[in-house]
Regions:
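Conserved catalytic core of two-metal-ion nucleotidyltransferases
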Residues: 61-63, 140-141
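Acyl activation and transfer enzymes in specialized metabolism, enriched
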Residues: 27-46, 102-118, 189-231, 377-379, ...
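Short, well-ordered loop/turn elements at secondary-structure boundaries
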Residues: 94-96, 206-209, 232, 327
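Non-catalytic, low-complexity flexible loops and terminal extensions
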Residues: 2-5, 107, 111-115, 119-202, ...
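Acyl-thioester-dependent acyl-group transfer interface
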Residues: 1-59, 67-91, 224-420
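Tryptophan-centered motif/residue detector
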Residues: 61-62, 90, 124, 220
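Histidine-centered acyl-transfer/condensation active-site motif
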Residues: 84-130, 135-146, 369-388
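A short, mixed-charge helix-start or loop-turn motif at secondary-structure junctions
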Residues: 21, 102, 181-183, 204
Length: 420
């Protein structure tokens, strides 16, 4: 079988890895043999993840790969799509009590990889610990039928017809930049934080079900506490999912896009609730509304999907789209929703997501997930240095929100080889 990839695949170059890493910390040491069995069984349920990239004419397609998905007994990074990875665009690993998943955004984005992760963890936990306390109703098991909606290409052939749409918001041409001396530029560093969900959301907008706007305000206030002369807007690129606008709620491609959200220098004197409300108005667009559909249309319009477009034209179009969507912001924040652990969190202590590349080397990146009763936050930057992390934690403390720094880590991400 062949599948259409995320169109950002055409933007791939040495500065745009478009891969991510998940680290799941279990409550006991990981059995590599049992994990390998769990991965092998789980992948039979997800043929659209068992793929290798292939050039067909002037397009890239994902072709079913019969070779096994690697499960390493360490934390190694490999080149996704390479022989070391059996040509696959994802791989697993484990070390001590941690499980690692490296995957390409070209096969999934948003929570598209979430069902696979839960299947693997369920099969592993069932063998190692038994099934007590686990709910299988929302876990795909290997013998379950595969719905067409899971792997169908979610992008329409033509833009939606929209009435009464507001103009798409454009990020300011100049955004507040981070202090280059805040990091030592010695590789990618992550700082792991835990925040109780109830404690934080009690301080946020009561109608805001997402932590994104509140965390963005806390980050904004941290910048202001460090720099009394901010004259440019602080701009976040915020991950937003248009699943409902596309009517593909279970699709592996949830159509993750980035919308600019910003606060002007004058906002530094606003009350936190006012800041949160203003930012929330920019971030939470709602579902199936004209503005959401218009944002979808922007992506469709950017796609070089004309039949006569050659590979070079597709690459140029997508690189332009990536540059306009990602570069030039102050920080990025991503939250794909509350994790439905189905009882698996009795065996999971922590989970963190990692991203980062040269196109974002002057930005802070925040990945927000949930486990148990906590938000788990990964703050990532291009080098070691706690200037912004400490300032962020201080702002939470001023709001009487408990926050725990779990640790810091120098990390690496997988590169990807493509037949371009």
């Amino acid at each position: 079988m062949k599948y259409k990839p995320n169109p950002l695949i055409y933007a791939a170059d040495k500065d745009f890895y478009s891969s991510f890493k998940l680290t799941i910390t279990m409550r006991s040491p990981v059995n590599h043999t049992a994990l390998a069995r769990a991965v092998g069984a789980a992948m039979t349920r997800y043929p659209y993840f068992c793929v290798f990239p292939e050039k067909v004419g002037e397009s890239i397609v994902l072709t079913f790969n019969q070779r096994s998905v690697p499960v390493f007994d360490d934390e190694r990074c490999v080149v996704l799509g390479s022989e070391e990875c059996n040509g696959h665009l994802l791989c697993f690993g484990c070390r001590e009590n941690q499980i690692f998943l490296h995957a390409s955004h070209y096969i999934a984005d948003g929570m598209g990889i979430d069902p696979l992760l839960k299947t693997v963890l369920y099969l592993y936990a069932a063998e190692e610990y038994g099934t007590d306390g686990l709910q299988t109703e929302r876990i795909h098991l290997p013998d379950e039928a595969i719905a067409d909606e899971e792997y169908a290409y979610p992008f329409p052939d033509a833009p939606f017809e929209i009435d009464n749409a507001l103009p798409l918001r454009k990020a300011p041409d100049n955004a507040y930049g981070l202090n280059p001396d805040a990091f030592d530029k010695d590789g990618l560093y992550a700082y792991h934080l835990h925040i109780p969900q109830r404690a934080m959301m009690s301080k946020a907008n009561p109608s805001d079900g997402s932590p994104v706007s509140f965390l963005s305000v806390m980050m904004y206030r941290a910048f202001c506490s460090l720099d009394a002369k901010i004259e440019l807007p602080v701009v976040a690129h915020v991950q937003h999912q248009y699943r409902q606008a596309l009517r593909t709620p279970i699709n592996r491609h949830s159509l993750v896009s980035y919308i600019p959200a910003f606060l002007p220098p004058s906002a530094r004197n606003w009350h936190v609730e006012q800041q949160n409300t203003v930012l929330r108005g920019q971030i939470i667009l709602g579902s199936e509304v004209a503005e959401d559909l218009q944002a979808v249309n922007r992506i469709i319009d950017a796609l070089p999907c004309e039949e006569n477009a050659d590979l070079a034209q597709k690459k140029a179009a997508m690189r332009k789209y990536v540059a306009e969507s990602i570069e030039g912001k102050t920080f990025g924040i991503s939250y794909v929703g509350k994790m439905d652990w189905c009882g698996l969190d009795q065996h999971v202590r922590d989970i963190h997501a990692y991203i980062g590349e040269k196109r974002t080397e002057n930005m802070l990146l925040m990945e927000v997930m949930t486990v148990g009763e906590d938000f788990t936050i990964n703050m990532m930057q291009s080098g070691r240095g706690r200037k912004y992390v400490d300032a962020f934690m201080e702002q939470l403390a001023l709001m009487e929100i408990p926050v725990t720094l779990i640790g810091e880590e120098r990390y690496t991400l997988c590169d990807t080889v493509l037949p371009l």
